[in-house]
């Protein structure tokens, strides 16, 4: 299946208008327990695009259901599960889903682009973590030094 029909990761950053998402929600709710896979997928896609974390989480849950129950939709689900987890900050999960897609489609440009975004975020957060740990260590060293000097003066 060609990879050019998947959107680029940056497209997921622009949420649907509330009225557009409501159309998808209404259709999903209207179909109830007999909801079709396409309706569920469309609603999950709209939720993933949201800028509201609870909606993104629900979108990931719906996509997980589709991935588990409908093998013919797994390819699309892999990409959107990677995208949804990326937006939620679940970078290990995002990478896992994205890498699975890349195993089958190494030339998939959208998935390659998403891999770069995931790697950049992981690197930035890693650097932030190192900076925080370094700052805490420095502060502890300064406090320890001050206490040591204070104890030395009392002797």
Curated annotation (Swiss-Prot):
TPR repeats mapped onto the chain: 75-108
Keyword Repeat: yes
Gene3D superfamilies referenced in this protein's UniProt entry, alphabetically: Tetratricopeptide repeat domain
Spans through the membrane: 128-148
Bilayer disposition of the protein: Single-pass membrane protein
Superkingdom, natural source: Eukaryota
Family matches, as CDD domains: Fis1
Record key words, sorted: Membrane, Mitochondrion, Mitochondrion outer membrane, Repeat, TPR repeat, Transmembrane, Transmembrane helix
Subcellular location: Mitochondrion outer membrane
Mitochondrial intermembrane side: 149-155
SUPFAM superfamilies tied to this protein: TPR-like
UniProt keyword Nuclease, yes or no: no
Family to which this protein belongs: Belongs to the FIS1 family.
Domain notes: The C-terminus is required for mitochondrial localization, while the N-terminus is necessary for mitochondrial fission.
Protein name: Mitochondrial fission 1 protein
């Amino acid at each position: 299946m060609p990879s050019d029909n998947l959107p680029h990761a940056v497209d997921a950053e622009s949420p649907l208008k509330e009225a557009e998402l409501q159309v998808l929600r209404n259709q999903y709710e209207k179909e109830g327990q007999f909801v079709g896979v396409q309706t569920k997928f469309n609603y999950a896609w709209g939720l993933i695009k949201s800028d509201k974390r609870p909606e993104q989480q629900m979108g990931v849950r719906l996509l997980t259901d589709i991935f588990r129950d409908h093998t013919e939709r797994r390819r699309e689900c892999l990409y959107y599960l990677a995208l949804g987890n990326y937006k939620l900050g679940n970078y290990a999960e995002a990478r896992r889903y994205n890498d699975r897609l890349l195993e089958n489609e190494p030339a998939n440009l959208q998935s390659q682009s998403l891999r770069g975004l995931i790697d950049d975020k992981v690197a930035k957060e890693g650097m932030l973590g190192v900076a925080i740990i370094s700052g805490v260590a420095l502060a502890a060293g300064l406090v320890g030094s001050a206490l040591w000097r204070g104890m030395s003066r009392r002797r």
